[in-house]
């Protein structure tokens, strides 16, 4: 976990969506001067980041992420940290029993991520990014959101229909994430993009394996790896044996 004290200020802030309850903004952190923005002639991706906080709290500019933003920009990446609506704000403890509430919160965040993505795609020249070179990343609730977003795209759901036809992200980075499925398991109709997962095996907030009630399941990194292996998908998984949810802040 990088030092939170490493101060870094955004190079730009844009409003990317207006909702009934709030306006949504994104902070853009450009690659540091003199940093390497390409590898062997290939441009490094733009990285969208979604903060954590259990869909109850959290902000795009929480100083605990400053160290990671600085490290990424010093390594030649453009980072875009986005707002999303907190669908569980004001809720009491939400577990699998209140799954409809959780489902709504996750998809609200996914909807906001897709709006941010469309804003970047519509202004690709300004962001100096190719449409096929955007990576999504997140911590905790943000990690759930990015994993769920790719699940929606790979399965061609109505949620993903707001994106340009044929669009997909270049990759997903999940710090203690999971996927919510009503199908009893996680299947992909189309091949998902390359996925990096980090998860503590003793995580009690976002399950490392799964929580399942009938066909409804919340599938963490440990369980998802089994599916990724089975289908020969492109993934990298870092298991942190004995660690809990602190891995959500390990970037």
What spans do the regions from the language model cover?
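Short amphipathic alpha-helix adjacent to the substrate-entry channel of hydrolases
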Residues: 60-82, 89
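Primarily recognizes the serine-hydrolase "nucleophile elbow" in alpha/beta-hydrolase
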Residues: 118-191
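Short beta-strand element of the alpha/beta-hydrolase
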Residues: 41-54
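The feature captures the conserved acid-bearing segment of alpha/beta-hydrolase catalytic domains
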Residues: 160-231
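Serine-hydrolase catalytic-loop signature spanning alpha/beta hydrolases and amidase-signature enzymes
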Residues: 54-57, 79, 119
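C-terminal catalytic histidine-bearing segment of alpha/beta-hydrolase fold enzymes
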Residues: 229-251
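N-terminal cap/lid segment of alpha/beta-hydrolase-fold proteins
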Residues: 6-42
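Alpha/beta-hydrolase active-site loop
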Residues: 100-126
């Amino acid at each position: 976990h990088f030092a939170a004290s490493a101060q870094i200020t955004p190079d730009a802030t844009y409003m990317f969506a207006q909702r009934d309850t709030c306006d949504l903004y994104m902070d853009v952190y450009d690659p540091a001067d003199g940093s390497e923005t390409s590898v062997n002639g290939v441009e490094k991706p733009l990285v969208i980041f979604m903060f954590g906080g259990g869909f109850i709290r959290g902000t795009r500019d929480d100083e605990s992420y400053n160290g990671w933003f600085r490290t990424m920009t010093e390594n030649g990446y453009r980072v875009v940290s986005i707002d999303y609506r907190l669908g569980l704000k004001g809720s009491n403890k939400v577990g699998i029993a209140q799954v409809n509430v959780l489902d709504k919160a996750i998809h609200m965040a996914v909807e906001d991520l897709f709006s941010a993505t469309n804003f970047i795609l519509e202004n690709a020249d300004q962001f100096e990014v190719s449409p096929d070179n955007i990576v999504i990343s997140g911590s905790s609730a943000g990690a759930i959101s990015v994993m769920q977003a790719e699940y929606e795209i790979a399965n061609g759901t109505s949620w993903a229909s707001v994106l340009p036809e044929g669009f997909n992200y270049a990759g997903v980075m999940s710090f203690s994430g999971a996927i919510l499925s009503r199908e009893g398991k996680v299947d992909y109709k189309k091949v998902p993009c390359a996925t990096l997962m980090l998860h503590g095996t003793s995580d009690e907030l976002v399950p490392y394996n799964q929580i399942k009630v009938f066909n409804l399941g919340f599938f963490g990194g440990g369980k998802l790896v089994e599916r990724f292996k089975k289908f020969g998908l492109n993934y990298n998984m870092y298991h942190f044996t004995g660690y809990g949810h602190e891995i959500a802040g390990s970037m």
